[in-house]
Structure formats: structure tokens, C-alpha cells
Amino acid sequence: VLEKFSGERFDNYVKNHILNPLGLYGGYCVDSLDKQKFVTLYEYNAKNSNHFSPSPAAYHPRRDEIKNYTLGYTTPIFSPTGGMKISATDLAKYMTMHMYKGSYKGTKIISKKSAKIMQTKLSDEENYGLALLQTTNLIEGKLMVGHTGSAYGLYSIMFFDPKEEFGIVAITNGCNPVYTKGFNDALRRTVNTLYNNLIMKK
């Protein structure tokens, strides 16, 4: 849909209309990024003597597929739901844009109306808006809004409290993916440790 109405390739649209305006370094097209900034991702395999295996496919180039790219059809090569390459610092800035209803440091990415729609859950069963989840299962007593990610051994979490205006981002890899109430236990502990020691004590 985005490519049809914008006429831009998905990765270029995200870079031109979101990343660059916010001053963020990242993207979906591996070939356009500095490989020196990539960190090796490791997949944890509990069934194989707790072995950690590198996941080189995470940075597989797409130059051959891009040569024959067709808008609206070839888009999945970028894994739009989880293929973004970005640092925790820049992901936190992106999160802050959502927390402030579409703007970050004077740069408007989406309207407040659109931001509210994205953050409003569509059903009580799933608690999801448009890619953003509402939950009280992450930090006790807090209604948090955000998103999690997992691919090639990487696990990430980006959640903010729209009322108290604080947010937490954490990215890790090579952990045993045990989940409780929908959240990776390692990331849940990390988020609560950061909250208890850096935010709640203020």
C-alpha cells in the first residue's frame, strides 16, 4: 500500500520520510549501510548443549533482488516487520517520537491524530493498535505502549508510558527465549531493572 501511493521503494520511503528527518542512522537495505557498524547476532540453542551460533543471514545483501524490484510485490525482501537495522540509541529516539504523538525535537513525522490511532487498541483480545501494543504485563501498575522484535537470535523491546512520559529500549541476542505473559523473560527483567533503578527512584 505504501509503495503504491508513494511511488517509492519501501526502504527508501522509510529512510527519506522517517529516519533522515529524525537524524537516525539505520535502514532496511543492508547494502546501503556501513558494515563496520554491524554486530554479529548469535542464536541460542538450548537443545544443542546451550550452544550459541552466529546468524550471518541477518545481514544478507539484497542487491540481486533489488535489480529486479517491482513496487508492491518485491517488498518482503526487506522483512518490513522486523528487518530494520538500527542502534538502541536511535531506536529510543524513534520511540520518543511516538511517545510525543508523532513529533521529536520539532520534527513532525505523523499527525497527533494518526499517532493516537496507532496507539489505540483495536480489540480487547490482542490489545494492538497499528503495530503498537498496549500492556500492563511489562511493568506492574503501568500501562505501556510499544513493540517487541525477534529475528536471527536478536530480541528487542521498545515500550513507553504515554502518561508519565518515560520509555525503555533494550536489545540483546543469544538468550534463552522463555516467555511469561507474552514477554521474553530476559528483556522483562532488563526493563524492570532499568525502571526500578533509573526511573522509579527519581
Regions found by a protein language model. Name each.
Residues 124-126, 137-139, 150-153, 159-164:
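A structural signal for short secondary-structure junctions
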Residues 174-202:
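Short, gly/Ser/Thr-rich active-site loops of penicillin-recognizing serine hydrolases
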Residues 133, 145-146, 151, 178:
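Glycine-enriched catalytic-core subsegment of oxygenase/oxidase enzymes
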Residues 1-145:
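Short, surface-exposed loop or secondary-structure junction motifs
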Residues 84-85, 98, 151-153, 174-177:
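Solvent-exposed loop/turn segments at secondary-structure junctions
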